[in-house]
From Swiss-Prot:
Phylogenetic placement of the source organism: Eukaryota, Viridiplantae, Streptophyta, Embryophyta, Tracheophyta
Keyword Transferase: yes
Enzyme class: transferase
Pathway: Protein modification; protein ubiquitination
Organism, scientific name: Arabidopsis thaliana
Family: Belongs to the RING-type zinc finger family. ATL subfamily.
Protein name in the entry: RING-H2 finger protein ATL46
Length: 376
């Protein structure tokens, strides 16, 4: 329509407006292509993805391999335990001991444990009330480790630093995983102690013990100094006492009768926490150590050696209480076999055939030597 109007106005010779401009499709530049939707992945990104995939694959294989290797020894151990039940039982006992005494403490060396003095319970001299008299059987005492009452033929090991004594096997088991006293947590050696040559210093030793009162508060007990007399070492023993009226602050001891358990040695005493306390007796108990029983001195009598190496009695006295006490077999691992206990006791007791110069110098042994020289 515009072209017709332009033609008419051109014939009349009157141009009202210039003719429209038309672009030549041949001379016009080509239009840019529309952007494509699918861009190509960069080779660098593709390389990184491949590397990560390979790393994840290798780590997965290593994880599966480690899990297989961990499970395989356990299966082998179970099959071995089925073939050898005795070995599996001993391994189970060792695991129980490690779990019970799983502490940062690595325990003591066996040579140090063997150097501690050993005596029979019937050899204790003194009375629990602080007066005179021979024999500690006037008042029964209990072992703080196994909770059993001491009998006359029981062998006890003394910790000279704190004067506490326990059953031979009980304290040996404890010291294999701990280096402190199980009762007062006191150290068994002074600063500068050498495991290879055990040396105890009794000159300036003081013991601080804290006792828990009936209402739960703690009070510091009287500090006592350990004095090494002529061939005599002090012994501090205690027993479990039951407090009936804990809330009123009045403690009443329950009379406990002792009975011998020969049929079932695995029976143990267990107490309700909070109703029983292990109370040390205010006693003047002492143990005389003859020259032939000290590892540092030469033996003079062979009869004492036979007495020291004699097997201890296996029957344990178990106290029975009217109420609040029950028997348990949860600590049967503490009880050794008869043959094992006798062999360990004979192995750990000092023998008279030992060479004097090869044994460690202990302070109570040096005290004997000084006293003998002064007497001469």
């Amino acid at each position: 329509m515009s072209w017709v109007r332009f033609t008419i106005e051109q014939k009349d010779g009157n141009f009202a407006y210039p003719p429209p401009f038309y672009k030549d499709p041949i001379l016009s530049p080509p239009s840019p292509p529309p952007p494509s939707s699918g861009n190509r992945i960069s080779p660098a990104v593709l390389f990184v993805i491949v590397i990560l995939a390979v790393l994840f694959f290798i780590s997965g294989l290593l994880h599966l391999l480690v899990r297989f290797l961990i499970k395989h020894p356990s299966a082998t151990a179970s099959s071995r335990s089925n073939r050898f039940p005795e070995i599996s039982t001993s391994d189970a006992l060792q695991r129980q001991l490690q779990q019970l005494f799983h502490l940062n403490d690595s325990g003591l060396d066996q040579a140090f444990i063997d150097a501690l003095p050993v005596f029979h319970y019937k050899e204790i001299v003194g009375s629990a009330g602080g007066g005179g008299g021979n024999g500690a059987a006037q008042e029964p005492f209990d072992c703080a480790v196994c909770l059993c009452e001491f009998s006359e033929k029981d062998k006890l090991r003394l910790l000279p630093m704190c004067s506490h004594a326990f059953h031979l096997n009980c304290i040996d088991t404890w010291l294999q995983s701990n280096s402190t006293c199980p009762l007062c947590r006191g150290t068994l050696f002074s600063p500068g102690f050498s495991m290879e040559n055990p040396m105890f210093d009794f000159d300036d030793i003081r013991e601080d013990e804290e006792g828990v009162t009936e209402n739960g508060s703690q009070k510091t007990m009287e500090i006592q100094e350990i004095v090494v007399e002529k061939g005599v070492l002090p012994v501090r023993l205690g027993k479990f006492k039951r407090l009936d009226n804990v809330g009123n602050g009045q403690g009443q001891d329950v009379v406990a009768g002792g009975e011998t358990s020969s049929s079932n040695l695995d029976a143990r005493r267990c107490f309700s926490m909070g109703s029983y306390q292990y109370i040390l007796g205010n006693s003047e108990l002492k143990v005389p150590f003859a020259n032939d029983r000290l590892p540092r001195l030469k033996p003079q009598d062979k009869e004492s050696e036979q007495t020291g190496n004699s097997s201890s009695e296996d029957n344990k006295k178990i106290n029975t209480v009217a109420k609040g006490e029950s028997f348990s077999v949860s600590k049967i691992w503490l009880w050794p076999k008869k043959d094992k206990f006798s062999s360990d006791a004979q192995r750990r007791l000092p023998s008279s055939s030992l060479n004097v110069d090869d044994l460690p110098k202990l302070p109570w042994m040096e005290e004997h030597k000084k006293l003998e020289n002064d007497g001469r």
